[in-house]
Amino acid sequence: MTKINKWLPVVALWLLPTVGAAQNTQPLVVPFSMQELVARCLVDFEGQPLCQEANNGDLNAQYAISSQYYDAGSAYSDLAMSWAFYAASRGSIPAQKQLAEMFLKGRGVPRDKVQSYEWYRTAAKSGDGEALYHIGSMNMDGIGAIMDRTRGIAYLQESARAYWAPAAYRLGLAFEEGEGVMVNMTQAVGFYTQAANAGIPEAQFRLARFYEEGRVLTKDNKQALILYTHAAELGHGNAQFALATLLRSEGGRLDEVIKWYREAAKAGIVGAQEQLGLILLRGDNGKAEYTEAYKWLAEAAQGGSALAEFGLGRIYEEGLGVVRNRKIAKLHYQKAVELGNISALLKLGKISLSEDKSEEALKYYQKAAGLGRMEARRQVGLMYMEGSGTKKDLVTAEKWLELAVSSGSTNAKYDLSRLYLLTKDEEKAVRLLREAAEAGVAEAQIELAARYAAGRGVEQSASQAYAWCMNVKECRPRVSYDCSRYGTMLDEHDREISLNRLKFLQENNHCSMH
């Protein structure tokens, strides 16, 4: 735009009625006469022919001047409004739409939604797609006119037929959500497709969801990725988040996943902030980045993310990039619990136990157990069995350990076998011990091996003792010694084979042979 001089004239107020104005609206106050406007134009635009063309009644010139003043900022709003009014009142559709926008936003004129609606309606009479979209939307939302969604839909459909893409998107939304029409997902997809093809990012995002979820359309993750990518590249935060999530589930490159999570996180998408923080905290990309992880988890926590609060709790509990502070860790875990994260109850229980607060720990574990957490059920059972935080109660311990077993805890089978030994039910104890050993519980395998070696509760068998000992996969003290001892109990042929195998494992630093 040509330089606009920094002077403001004395405002001369005069009144003109608004074209198509509704009842009970104030007449438009136009600050300048045409003579004053032309004089000002010649100064501001340095004598451009545009000013004289506007003075001669050229509507395009009048609108062009108005538009340049409008773009120059609020200091020139009176001039923009005056030029827009002269052009609009003489039939300039662009000027009518600009005047409608000025009334809607209160720029250069008092904010007046009714006047805005009337000017958009005047422009719409010519079939202008944008104006039809605005009055359709205003009817849908009851802005500047009585809410009439049937009329709003009609205007939006007319606008969409004029190839105004935002109208197609709004119609897609209406048919998806049943806004002024019956829910019709097929229609919604059709309008979203029209809008998406025209480059509307929100339509691309919503259409991608239909492809990803297989609703109405055949499930097609490839097409969903294409649409998410288009919308993401246009800066659509939710599309960036959805793109990262889908790429991750499809086994896409982690650097691409992180890139889009980061873009969505910058756009304020809480889920992206949460996931990016957790990825960086775990070091999924090869190296943990605690400082950036903390930043994103803190932002997500402010947005109400339970997982982010849990992650912050872990950072403080373990001292990951910060000074270790269990007190702060507990605060974050407690917030996570308030937001529905059950795992945080287990963390609180663990911290309480480390602080010798077994009664407090039991309360946390009982709450998690009541919510169905297998690990918590097992821990409650153990605490009742050992009398930790409560009176020793083997009946209650048995109940919780059985619940843990029914939830799938193989470790609880081993614990329950120990309990049955306390209650002198060796048959049950050995049965559960064997089940736990077969499921890979190291303690059960070691105990079962010892029982076979000694013939306690089972028929004595050196080969079984040796076999169960060699099954232990975890690093355990004395396992190498015990396996050697059981090996010497075998007959000469088997003993030679077993000891050679043991020697090989030891020489190759087999973990269980420490």
Locate each region found by the language model.
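Terminal, low-structured helical/coil segments at or just beyond the last alpha-helical repeat
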Residues: Q26-L28, E474-H514
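Short helix-capping/linker turns of helical repeat alpha-solenoids
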Residues: N55-D58, Y70-G73, S89-S92, K105-R107, ...
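N-terminal leader/linker segments that initiate helical-solenoid repeat arrays
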Residues: G20-Y70, S82, C511-H514
